[in-house]
Curated annotation (Swiss-Prot):
One of its GO terms (biological process) is L-leucine biosynthetic process. Its main location: cytoplasm. Its EC number is 2.3.3.13. It comes from Shewanella sediminis (strain HAW-EB3). It is an enzyme of class 2 (transferase). This is 2-isopropylmalate synthase. It is found in: Cytoplasm.
């Protein structure tokens, strides 16, 4: 049996399901390209039948990514499989991942069918998917709670139908390692054609055991692990890609297994996903948390000064976290910025040098010295920029009375090419600025969440504002980044307004299409 473990990343499918607001196609593509550089073997990038937006993002990624196999999810229904195949058809090689529930509670309560009927649907779905590609993966949803006799039967029949990968999910994170490892061991012992497929596992983290269960599974013969960057996903999340990659690398002496992951891309990819998904990484998170390589105890610090191996089983450099002694100021040339970006793992196609350097100079003039985390933040923010924005902030002036708490703000907005100026008061400068923008734009959004975080250290650190807002029963996520908190707050709101404007245009297009169809007699 091969010692190579296939890494199947589902950040853009299962991971995105945990987000309060969906990612844009541009943001998904940026993450997909980062995953490609990270070296994932397969990336599951969406559920095409679920929406035109998901279909479009899958198609865009499939047309762009070349070094990782792109996969789309489909229920055991022909319409789902058709949508997946159509969205993926632009790729040279692709995978269709079809699934159906197999546990008793799912079969009886959710599907309201007999197990034999579900088995027939599964076999039919695999055979239908094989019409489009030889690379078909089949998942037994809630396999962790499926009676073992039924699971063995389902796996055997799916392989006979043509599935080349069989995925065994612990969908609700219920099993413990001894149980889950036992399931994989039983499949290898009892399914006669098991050698004709790769066994995959997809473990959720409801009991905090997703990584442990996945490692136990590969010890029993599974050779694909499904995971997400930073472990994001439904409920408590998924198996963490970075933890799996570094466990298999650091403990190769014990496990004897390896992956194709370029570990030096882990830190950069983790930061990118955290930023674009608006999901901060907890400080004590294994591998990528801010404290993962921090030593506070005097005894630990003394040991580290004598030898890093005393308290570090891996180095920061091994995951691409570089110690930087290069000071970047407004006197730094473009070559310095380009060199630093390359050291942090960014390629030329990840950012526009002209845009980044202009933003760098503006920031350097404000705060003097610019650090790695500043450059990363500026690079990430490129994905938030909409070149065809309907709303642009031209000017912001704020006057605040610190004793009374009242403030006045004047904003100048460019709206569809026209300049509009409005002033308003409010309970603090941010409230005043938001009131002025509401007057100027006549765009009514309901802000449901406001988060402020520092990107860096000291009084001149960049401030990032993340807001979530409801508009026409949809949720939107806006981001702003500036050394001034009020400016960052305004940027975030303007970002949301541009997203809502785009949503209105999409709705108008849909309405026109429906009207045209109606006039043509429903054709």
């Amino acid at each position: 049996m091969s010692n190579r473990v296939i890494i199947f990343d589902t950040t853009l499918r299962d991971g995105e399901q945990a987000l309060a607001a969906s990612l844009t196609v541009k943001e998904k593509l940026q993450i997909a390209l980062s995953l490609e550089r990270l070296g994932v073997d397969v990336m599951e990038v969406g559920f095409p039948v679920s929406s035109p937006g998901d279909f479009n993002s899958v198609q865009t990624i499939a047309n762009t990514v070349k070094n990782s196999r792109v996969c789309a999810l489909a229920r055991a229904l022909e319409k789902d499989i058709d949508a997946a195949a159509q969205s993926l058809s632009v790729a040279d090689q692709f995978r269709i991942h079809t699934f159906i529930s197999t546990s008793t509670i799912h079969v009886e309560s959710k599907l309201k069918r007999s197990f034999d009927q579900v088995l027939e649907m599964a076999v039919g779905a695999v055979k239908y998917a094989r019409r489009f590609t030889d690379d078909v993966e089949f998942s037994c949803e809630d396999a962790g709670r499926t009676p073992i006799d039924n699971l063995c039967r389902m796996v055997e029949e799916a392989i006979k139908a043509g599935a080349r990968t069989i995925n065994i999910p612990d969908t609700v994170g219920y099993t413990i390692p001894s149980e889950f490892g036992g399931i994989i061991e039983t499949l290898f012992n009892r399914v006669p054609n098991i050698d004709q497929a790769i066994i995959s596992v997809h473990c959720h983290d409801d009991l905090g055991l997703s990584v442990a269960n996945s490692i136990t599974a590969v010890q029993q013969g599974a050779r694909q692990i499904e995971c997400t960057v930073n472990g994001i996903g439904e409920r408590a999340g998924n198996c963490s890609l970075e933890e799996i990659a570094m466990i298999l690398s650091t403990r190769k002496d014990s496990l004897g297994l390896e992956t194709g992951i370029n570990a030096k891309e882990i830190h950069r990819t983790s930061n990118l996903v955290s930023q674009l998904c608006n999901m901060p990484v907890q400080a004590n998170k294994a591998i990528v948390g801010a404290n993962a390589f921090t030593h506070s105890s005097g005894i630990h610090q003394d040991g580290m000064l004598k030898s890093q191996n005393t308290y570090e089983i891996m180095t920061p450099e091994s995951i691409g976290l570089h110690r930087n002694n290069l000071n970047m100021t407004s006197r730094s040339g473009r070559h310095v910025i380009k060199h630093r970006m390359e050291e942090m793992g960014y390629g030329n196609k990840d950012y526009d040098m002209d845009t980044l350097y202009e933003a760098f100079l503006q920031l350097a003039d404000k705060k003097g010295q610019v650090f790695d985390y500043d450059l990363e933040a500026l690079a990430f923010m490129e994905a938030q920029v909409d070149e065809e924005a309907d709303y642009k902030l031209a000017q912001l002036v704020v006057h605040s009375d610190s004793t009374e708490g009242n403030a006045t703000a004047t904003v100048k907005l460019e709206i569809d090419g026209k300049t509009v100026t409005e002033a308003a008061t409010g309970n603090g400068p941010v409230d005043a600025a938001y009131n002025a923008i509401a007057r100027a734009s006549q765009c009514e959004v309901n802000i449901t969440s406001y988060k402020l975080s520092a990107k860096g250290e000291g009084q001149n650190a960049l401030g990032q504002v993340d807001i979530e807002a409801n508009y026409n029963e949809q949720s939107f996520h806006g981001v702003g980044l500036a050394t001034d908190v009020v400016e960052a707050s305004v940027q975030a709101l303007v970002h949301v307004m541009n997203l809502t404007s785009r949503a209105d245009k999409v709705a108008d297009c849909k309405e026109k299409i429906q009207k045209d169809r109606s006039e043509l007699g429903g054709v």
